[in-house]
Structures are given as C-alpha cells and as structure tokens.
Design a protein with these regions (language model features):
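Structured, active/binding-site neighborhoods that engage oxygen-rich ligands
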Residues: 1-284
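Cysteine-based protein phosphatase catalytic domain of the PTP/DSP
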Residues: 287-288, 294-355
Length: 355
C-alpha cells in the first residue's frame, strides 16, 4: 500500500532540511560551547558548515542516480565540497575531497553520520535506509564504527518519518540499542557538564539520538536546544538531532521549526545550495502529492508523460520507489501514449478511454 496513510499535506512555503537547521544553529557554538538550553537560535555569525554541504551532496546523489552507485556519490561530494572547500572539513576529509582518486581511509569520525539524513527521508524501507547509509559512509568512512554511525542516523530518520507518533520514540530506541548497539541509558542533563569535544561516531551519535529521545514529545527546537547544550562538536550534534526531530510523516521536511528560524537559516544559504534543498523536498514529496489514496491503495495521479521512453521510465521508477503500484489513465483515444510496456513487474495499469 506504499507510504501514504491519508491525504498528503500541503508542503509549507517555508521549509528546510532539519540537518541544515541544526548545523547552522550549532555553528557558533562548536568552538564556544555553551552548557545551557537558553540561547539565541540564530545569532550573528551563524553560518552553514561542511555538515550542510555534504548533506546536500547526498541529497543530490539520491536525486540524480537511481542506481545509487558509490562513484556517483563521490562525484557529488567532490563537486560541492571543492566549491565550498572552506566550509570546515577535517584535514583527512579535505584531502579526500581534493584527491583525483579518492579512497576510503578507515575513519570512524562523525562525518559519515552528519551527511546521511536525506537517505532516511528517501528510503522505502528500514533495510534500504541501512544499505544506502552503508554505501554513503563506505566511500570515505569505511571503519565499522563510521558505517554504524551513519546507519544509526539514517535508521532513526526513517523510523521517525514512518512509525506511528505514539510508538516512534520506542521503535527508535529499540532500533538503536538492539540493531546498532549504542547505550542510550544516560540522562543528558546529568552528564552535560562532563561531556567534552568528541568527533567520533561512537562519542557523538548516541548523544544526538538521546537528545531527540529525551525531548521527543516537544517541538523539535527543544531537542535541538538540548543537543547544543551538551557542548562538544555542537554543529554536528545539532545537525544529527535536528535531522531526526524534524523528520515528519509523508516526507514533509522541517516544518515544525519556527518560521523565523527557518527563514534566517534559508537566508544564510547561497542560491545553489538552497536549490538542492528545495529540489530534494519536491523530489521526495511530489510522487505522493500527485497520487490518490483510494480504498487502501495508492494510485498514480499523473501520466508519466514523455514521448521519450527513457524519460518516462525514470519518472515511473521514481513513482514506484515511493510506493505507487497502480497506474490509471483516463484519456481521449489517441491523446496519450500508452506506457504499459515501461512498467515493472508487480505494478498494475488500467486505461479507460473517454468518449
């Protein structure tokens, strides 16, 4: 029956990937840690960092390569990374970005986890989220802990956007403790003063997840404030926490943050990065916006509509990925080109001529 469980909500005019909001809010606190949840969200000096650039590189990869090839991801990461080379990368990753033949370097830094959230929004199952997260991490952060950190965040984002509201926090906790193997027993308020800067996955990803879980029944800003208040690698912890907290049903992104916060964050992004953010939102929501939920089934609401078979085939693949398994044409005879031959197995097609 696909993803849709009701009428698709209208996308708000003001939106942004939660990971980017968290990155920007944490950007002024990375080297000037604060240990309080009472702070200005987007003060003067706030900026996007490498977390934002690489998050959008992953989003671009998902939009442009339906085969999800590692070499395509590398190309997306290097293109954006080189354009914004002073965004704040670690020394090893900077070398990787500039290398003519980049190779993974066995890193377990949190760079693999900070960029992965678009995968959780895109994936059609938890298994797909974990596999794509593995691919996305392995091109650079191929240490088992680097892969585990990416899978943890991708899985949490997927579950947050798919589980029922009453059980999402339980399912995320269960997934992280049983599948990933992180210990989530600490109360962050109790360890806040002793927590220090740690850029490893195992030292920062659980903190980010606990910040969400310990504020799950509040607006996402509360979870982000708790995450930033821990100190440490604030922009990346904020990026990961906000990515989870902002994930919503039906893939509407970032709409629970205050409009003014979102507007300030959007104003800090250059046009090309903002374009990727907005295109990705359309990419993950358009198939559902242009479909119909009827008697328990999801029907395509738009003819894939290109005379060129390859273009039509890509559109169909996009729709099917997001759970649309039934296609219906209501058409005057001769008006639309049939496309039954382009549909994969397991998909139904009905064509009703209009007199």
């Amino acid at each position: 029956n696909g993803r849709c469980k009701g009428n698709v909500e209208k996308i708000r005019e003001v939106s942004m990937l939660g990971a980017i909001i968290g990155d920007i809010v944490g950007s002024t606190r990375e080297w000037h840690n604060i240990k309080t949840e009472d702070f200005e969200m987007v003060p003067t000096g706030s900026r996007f960092t490498d977390d934002t650039v690489m998050t959008l590189a992953v989003a671009e990869w998902l939009m442009t390569d339906s085969k999800h090839k590692p070499e395509t991801l590398v190309a997306c990461m290097q293109r954006l990374g080189r354009k914004y080379i002073n965004a704040g990368y670690g020394s090893m990753f900077r070398k990787w970005l500039l290398s003519e033949h980049p190779q993974p370097y066995n890193s377990f830094g949190n760079g693999s986890a900070m960029r992965v959230s678009p995968i959780g929004l895109y994936a059609n199952s938890l298994e797909e989220a974990l596999e794509l997260a593995r691919i996305s991490a392995s091109v650079s952060h191929n240490h088992p802990e680097g892969i585990k950190g990416a899978q943890a965040i991708a899985g949490c984002v997927y579950l947050k956007s798919h589980a029922a509201w009453s059980t999402e926090h339980y399912k995320i906790n269960q997934f992280v403790t049983e599948t990933i193997g992180y210990n989530l027993d600490s109360q962050l308020e109790d360890i806040r003063n002793e927590y220090t800067f740690d850029v490893t996955c195992q030292g920062s990803v659980p903190i980010a997840i606990m910040a969400y879980l310990q504020r799950y029944n509040y607006p996402p800003e509360k979870a982000l404030r708790l995450a930033i208040s821990m100190g440490g690698d604030s922009d990346t912890i904020g990026c990961m926490t906000a990515a989870i907290a902002a994930a919503e049903k039906l893939n509407v992104i970032g709409s629970d943050f205050d409009d003014e916060v979102i507007k300030k964050c959007r104003a800090l992004l250059p046009t090309d990065l903002l374009d990727i953010n907005d295109r990705f939102e359309g990419f993950i929501s358009k198939p559902l916006k242009q479909s119909y939920y009827l008697h328990g089934y999801l029907y395509a609401g738009e003819y894939p509509g290109d005379r060129k078979n390859e273009v039509a085939k890509r559109k169909i693949e996009h729709m099917v990925h997001f759970g649309i398994k039934h296609f219906v044409d209501l058409t005057v005879e001769g008006e639309l080109k049939p496309y039954r031959h382009l549909l994969p197995k397991g998909v139904t097609y009905m064509r009703f001529p209009i007199p």
